[in-house]
């Protein structure tokens, strides 16, 4: 279980990997800058570097982060929030994505801020409004749903 008592508004990578089942190269949250579990809010960060393997093919002469991976990063940040709102013996996994829109490209060197605000939480899962921002401008947005499953299923 994650101890939020030391700094209740931030999580480091060690705390993140204790919550999320993802690992390199698919762990897309580097830090949680702010989290308020009671209010249902999270602000996380992904540092986008040219070393990301997906830039080799997307696209070699004009690298941009694939939109589906931006959504995955948002889902991982949201999954942290939903998990911390839920029962400790379960994990929040992606259920659905609705109203996804991509507003601007995300490029190597960008700092991607992943913002999630709770729309609904229950004992079965949750739903968030999510925004990915670069330089305080929306790069992508969506509503993301989660369901709880036993950790043994992952």
UniProtKB/Swiss-Prot annotation:
Q: Keywords for this entry?
A: Cytoplasm, Lipid A biosynthesis, Lipid biosynthesis, Lipid metabolism, Lyase
Pull one GO CC term from this UniProt entry.
Answer: membrane
Query: Where does the UniProt annotation locate this protein?
Result: Cytoplasm
> Which biological processes are named by the entry's GO terms?
fatty acid biosynthetic process; lipid A biosynthetic process
Give the enzyme's EC designation. 4.2.1.59
Give the source's domain of life in one word.
Bacteria
GO MF term set = (3R)-hydroxyacyl-[acyl-carrier-protein] dehydratase activity
Give the active-site positions.
58
* Coiled-coil region list: none
Q: Which reaction does it catalyse?
A: a (3R)-hydroxyacyl-[ACP] = a (2E)-enoyl-[ACP] + H2O
Q: Which family does it belong to?
A: Belongs to the thioester dehydratase family. FabZ subfamily.
**Family matches, as HAMAP family:** FabZ (MF_00406)
* Role according to the record: Involved in unsaturated fatty acids biosynthesis. Catalyzes the dehydration of short chain beta-hydroxyacyl-ACPs and long chain saturated and unsaturated beta-hydroxyacyl-ACPs.
What's the protein here called? 3-hydroxyacyl-[acyl-carrier-protein] dehydratase FabZ
**Organism of derivation:** Protochlamydia amoebophila (strain UWE25)
Q: What is the lineage of its organism?
A: Bacteria, Pseudomonadati, Chlamydiota, Chlamydiia, Parachlamydiales
